[in-house]
Amino acid sequence: MTRTQKEKMLAGEMYNAADPEIQADLLAAGAWLKRYNSTLGDSAEQWHLFLRERLGEVGPGAVIRPPFHCDYGFNISIGAHAYMNFNCVILDVAKVTIGDGTAIGPAVQIYTADHPDDPEQRQAGLQLGRPVRIGKHVWIGGGAIILPGVTIGDHAIVGAGSVVTRDVPAGAKVMGSPARVRG
């Protein structure tokens, strides 16, 4: 049985992003984001209700301050009382899991989207995704970038402006570009 491009995307396999089903999901997410981002002056409770319309899982008390940007939304799970400040971007072609009580600063970017090394595959529009997992009670400073396939352990701290290219152990403090364990 042949799998759809969306099924391949969700399985972390190479897929064609120009597929009509995938494009329809992008358009639906874009329409939702337009509505969500127009709620800038609303309460955290109102934002929470909006998030439950689109995101895969939304824990009690979770907040994402608009403006916010994502590819699809349905691949994002945000835990109880997790907080994302404004101008965050999540490219969620694969699962993004954000643990309970995690605090994410403004303009943080989380990427699951990846591209093949082969230029012919890239030119053909093929891409893939690798999931990002962020543990419980993590603090990610403003402007940090989390690359595809990274896991950040519970209670870790990512310094502002850091580029996280590899896994971060639980309780570690990382900073820099690329992010390295410090102190």
Regions inferred by a protein language model and the residue ranges of each:
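Terminal amphipathic alpha-helical/low-complexity segments used for targeting or macromolecular assembly
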Residues: 1-61, 179
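Short secondary-structure boundary/capping segments
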Residues: 6-7, 54, 124, 131, ...
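Short arginine-rich
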Residues: 35-37, 166-171
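Flexible, glycine/small-residue-enriched loop-and-beta-strand segment within the central core
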Residues: 68-78, 83-151, 172, 177-183
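Short beta-to-alpha loop/turn elements within the nucleotide-binding domains of ABC transporters
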Residues: 150, 162, 168
